[in-house]
A protein has these predicted regions:
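Short, compositionally biased segments
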Residues: 4-7, 12, 188-193, 200
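SF2 helicase/translocase NTPase motor core
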Residues: 5-7, 12-14, 21, 25-181
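Conserved helicase ATPase motor motifs in RecA-like P-loop NTPase domains
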Residues: 78-79, 180-198
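PAPS/PAP-binding and catalytic site of the sulfotransferase fold
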Residues: 87, 194-203
Length: 203
């Protein structure tokens, strides 16, 4: 909390996002708190390298926006093609940076994502730690096998699943993503059920 005077001049607490310290922060302490919330990389994307013909127009529009933003969320209902959009986002980053991209999926979905890649001509490999310069696919539970500095992009499939993880796992995922310059969250069930799940998304 930080102190602020209300209209009558009496002090009252004002919540600072994520702050738990008591009143009376020094300027340096508050600045350190703000700095701790800054993103590692500056935001901003790039002009898409490719928007393949197999995409529908609305998918191209969403991807053009997401790639130019660099950090985005695609909230699309079931059946609207989130998997090909994830693959194209990751493939664009690989082509732009010549560095690997990582797609995180629920346990039962990683093999399906690889098959979708084959269907659409995007090479994607299921991996448990061996990384290649291309689209790597793994499940959330294996994230600890990877180094975030190896990747230019990370894509979270069914990102609403993050709220179901216990605190340490959720924190590990958000800290991993925080280091990676290009990020995409995808889900069909976007509504956060609590302020903590909304905060996880914004990180």
């Amino acid at each position: 909390w930080v102190r602020r005077e209300d209209r009558e001049g009496s002090p009252r607490g004002v919540a600072v996002a994520g702050a738990t310290a008591g009143e009376g922060w020094s300027v340096n302490a508050y600045q350190n708190f703000v700095n701790s919330k800054l993103q590692v990389e500056s935001s901003g994307g790039f002009v898409p390298v490719t928007l393949p013909d197999f995409l529908f127009d609305f998918q191209k529009y969403l991807l053009d926006w997401a790639i130019r933003k660099g950090r985005a969320a695609i909230l699309a209902d079931c059946g609207l093609g989130k998997t090909p959009m994830q693959l194209v986002f990751a493939d664009n980053v690989v082509r732009h940076t010549n560095k690997p991209a990582l797609i995180l999926t629920p346990l039962a979905v990683s093999s399906q994502t690889v098959r979708e890649g084959e269907k659409f001509g995007i090479e994607a490999r299921k991996t448990s730690g061996d990384v290649f310069v291309g689209v790597n696919v793994t499940n959330y539970e294996k994230l600890h096998h990877f180094n975030p500095n190896d990747f230019a992009a990370v894509v979270c499939d069914e990102s609403s699943i993050l709220k179901s993880f216990e605190g340490t796992t959720r924190q590990a995922i958000t800290e991993f993503m925080r280091v990676v310059p290009y990020r995409l969250l995808c889900t069909a069930t976007a509504a956060p059920s609590s302020s903590s799940s909304a905060a996880t998304w914004t990180r």
